[in-house]
């Protein structure tokens, strides 16, 4: 299950990434490249990470008109990344266009990247959703609605909180992919995320993938922190 543990490379540039990855010589990681790093370094950072043997979740959360998203996904698929995402709030036509773009852009002989949709950010509380975003449903209802729409649009799964995974299993089935950020070791600060969980709790709730950032990247010993998270995620007793 180690390949379903995704390490968030939330760094401002390649130099920081190189320094961090020195702790993981010989390890093939599944890493997340977000907006900050990709916008600074461009496709070259993807090439660098692929050459190191790492799998890549390119976390750009596309949200635009269908034709623009289709064209963007065609370009992203050509980078040979393993996972990409969009905002479910973009609607069914946009999500279907994303899949079309990925199919057109995928490298010959390769499967298209896994495509998932963001339901609600883990920094979103129910009060914020109702007051600022204008959604009157409960948070769980809103996430379930977006997840169902995502599945009907042909995507592979969603980004969601661990707390929502059991409900989404009911709504979308056991094969529907759930990628859960907001993962912290019990001793860590939650920082700016509201809906968080430990690796053990994520496993118990049925997450397909977990995304772990600061618990590993800010640790005094990132490799040891990675091993601790991995052990908890895989249910290994040491």
Swiss-Prot record:
Q: Which residues form the active site?
A: 61
| Role | Catalyzes the decarboxylation of orotidine 5'-monophosphate (OMP) to uridine 5'-monophosphate (UMP).
Please give the family membership noted in the entry: Belongs to the OMP decarboxylase family. Type 1 subfamily.
Query: Which residues are listed for substrate binding in this entry?
Result: 10, 32, 59-68, 122, 184, 193, 213-214
Under the heading HAMAP family, the entry gives: OMPdecase_type1_B
Instruction: Provide the catalytic activity annotation.
Output: orotidine 5'-phosphate + H(+) = UMP + CO2
User: What are its E.C. numbers?
Assistant: 4.1.1.23
Top-level taxon of the source organism: Bacteria
Matching CDD domains: OMP_decarboxylase_like (cd04725)
Q: Which NCBIfam families match?
A: PRK00230.1, pyrF
The protein, known as = Orotidine 5'-phosphate decarboxylase
Gene from which the chain derives: pyrF
């Amino acid at each position: 299950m180690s390949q379903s543990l995704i390490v968030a490379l939330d760094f401002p540039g390649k130099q920081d990434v190189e320094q961090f990855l020195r702790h993981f010589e010989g390890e093939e990681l599944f890493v997340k490249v977000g907006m900050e790093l990709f916008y600074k370094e461009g496709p070259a950072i993807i090439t660098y990470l692929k050459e190191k043997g790492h799998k890549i979740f390119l976390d750009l959360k596309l949200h635009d008109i269908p034709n623009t998203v289709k064209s963007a996904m065609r370009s992203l698929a050509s980078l040979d990344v393993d996972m990409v995402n969009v905002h479910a709030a973009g609607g069914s036509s946009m999500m279907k266009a994303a899949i079309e773009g990925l199919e057109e852009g995928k490298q010959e002989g390769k499967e298209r990247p896994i495509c998932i949709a963001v339901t609600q950010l883990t920094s979103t509380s129910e009060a914020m959703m109702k007051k600022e975003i204008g959604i009157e449903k409960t948070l769980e209802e809103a996430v379930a609605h977006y997840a169902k729409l995502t599945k009907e649009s042909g995507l592979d799964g969603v980004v969601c909180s661990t707390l929502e995974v059991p409900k989404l299993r009911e709504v979308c089935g056991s094969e529907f992919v759930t990628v859960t950020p907001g993962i912290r070791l019990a001793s860590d600060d939650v920082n700016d995320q509201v809906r968080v969980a430990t690796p053990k709790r994520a496993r118990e709730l049925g997450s397909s993938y977990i995304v772990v950032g600061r618990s590993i990247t800010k640790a005094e010993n990132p490799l040891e922190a990675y091993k601790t998270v991995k052990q908890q995620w895989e249910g290994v007793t040491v």
